Amino acid sequence: DGTPFTAEDVIFTWQYCTAPDGGCAQKAQYEGVKSVEALDPTTVKVTFTEPKYYPYSAFVGAQSPIIQKAQFKDCVGAKAPGCTSANFGPIGTGPFVVKEFKPNDVVTYVANPNYRDAAKPAFASVTLKGGGDAPSAARAVLETGEFDYAWNMQVEPEVLATMIAKGKGKIETAFGTQVERINLNCFNPDPALGDKRSTTEAGPPPALKDPAVRKALSIAI
């Protein structure tokens, strides 16, 4: 909205999302955050209760945006669900502003006139269509050309190849703010162990006791 984005907004976001009875959907992102301190108007110091292998999701991840203190200061805790206007029209610093929002259907954005880079954004408006599945999203871009971009192209390779052959679009890969990882079960998953399966009491899986197996898994990944 043209007002400064400051460290106080970052601190407030943490306080807002961890307030009791607030119902913040991303509260889990802030687990382990001990304190948030403003060192100057544009710098914050975040202290954790213990070392974090990936400490960024709490404040710069795609799932936990910073909210404006001035807009939400009266919406903390149990008051949060009642702040309909703020909840459906949060003020941010991005290149676009929400013009229309239909839950589980469509979101329409228009260029933010207050954006920090006057030369951007490159588009006057953007429409995001929800619902459907990966094949229908891929088809709308690659096969019919109905949309310009689709996320989640997890479609069988042979099906994807047929769509690409239509010549309406192409596949591009890029880095995002989220992390994909493979979790290895380090405990015995044998169903015969009952409630102890896949717990510390179960001990390691028999196969993983062999160093050669562990090395093979490492090479495969």
Predicted regions and their residues:
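Extracytoplasmic/periplasmic ligand-capture domains
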Residues: D1-A25, S35-E37, P95-I221
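A short beta-strand/turn structural motif
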Residues: K52-T93, V97, K120-F123, T127-L128
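Tryptophan-centric aromatic hotspots in well-structured domains and transmembrane helices
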Residues: W14, F48, P55-Y56, T84, ...
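Surface-exposed binding/hinge segments that line
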Residues: F5, Q26-V76, E100
